[in-house]
Regions:
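Extended, histidine- and acidic-residue-enriched regions that form the cofactor-binding/catalytic faces
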Residues: 106-180
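Catalytic cores of processing enzymes, dominated by hydrolases/peptidases
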Residues: 57-134, 178
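Histidine- and/or cysteine-centered catalytic micro-motif in compact active-site loops
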Residues: 22, 52-54, 112-113
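Internal, conserved structured core segments that host functional sites
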Residues: 14, 26-74
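N-terminal short beta-loop-beta anion/metal-coordinating cradle
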Residues: 1-21
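Short, basic, glycine/proline-bearing loop/turn elements
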Residues: 15-25, 80-84
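Hydrophobic/aromatic beta-strand patches that form the interior of the parallel beta-sheet core
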Residues: 17-19, 49, 106-111
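Solvent-exposed alpha-helices and their adjacent loops that cap or buttress functional pockets
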Residues: 8-13, 41, 100-103
Length: 180
């Protein structure tokens, strides 16, 4: 069975390369991180930008974005755009390995605060918003926000169906009105 660990997308007009490290790479994080660093050097990339989600116990409507960078200028610019500095925390997986192997390449790590253990389109939209301004991409995050709303409504409907199915039925035919 062939397993893809990376998906690579190239936007030639903007000279951007997007690399998606597939989750579930346990045990291969270092090899994937090394491949990303090698590719960035091969392409003479100005910067590696890593996007990640971080679970938050808060139920806020919007997601905060945290930044950690080995490039002072990039970090300063992202802080001006509203990101908060990531000072501590445990980062694992490909992102954690990248953080430890990118000293020779300008690297910036953005973490979107998610409010569930499921995919969070609102958090993704916040990341897109920040990247849009930072890189001047002109990308509209509205489709992600719409997707988040649709997903949330489906979850609410499923929860309501589950609650409704647990309620006792008030069916007259089920009542015994005599003994005999």
């Amino acid at each position: 069975e062939t397993r893809r660990l990376l998906e690579i997308f190239h936007a030639p007009k903007e000279n951007l390369v997007f690399i998606h490290a597939i989750s579930g790479t346990k045990g291969l994080e270092w090899e994937v991180a090394k491949a990303i660093v090698e590719l960035s050097k091969l392409l003479n990339a100005k910067q590696i930008i890593s996007l990640e989600g971080v679970v938050s116990p808060d139920n806020a409507e919007t997601s905060r974005i945290f930044v950690k960078s080995n490039d002072y200028k990039s970090e300063k610019e992202l802080l001006k755009l509203g990101a908060e500095k990531l000072d501590r925390g445990a980062v694992t997986g490909v992102t954690g390995a990248l953080m430890l192997t990118t000293e020779s390449v300008n690297s910036t790590f953005l973490f979107a605060e998610t409010h569930s253990r499921m995919p969070d389109s609102r958090a993704a939209a916040e990341l897109i918003r920040m990247l849009d301004v930072y890189l001047n991409l002109k990308v509209d995050p509205k489709p992600l926000i719409k997707q988040a709303e649709d997903f949330e409504n489906k979850i609410k409907d499923m929860i309501k169906l589950g609650i409704d199915s647990q309620k006792p039925e008030d069916d007259e035919s089920q009542k015994v009105n005599y003994l005999g």
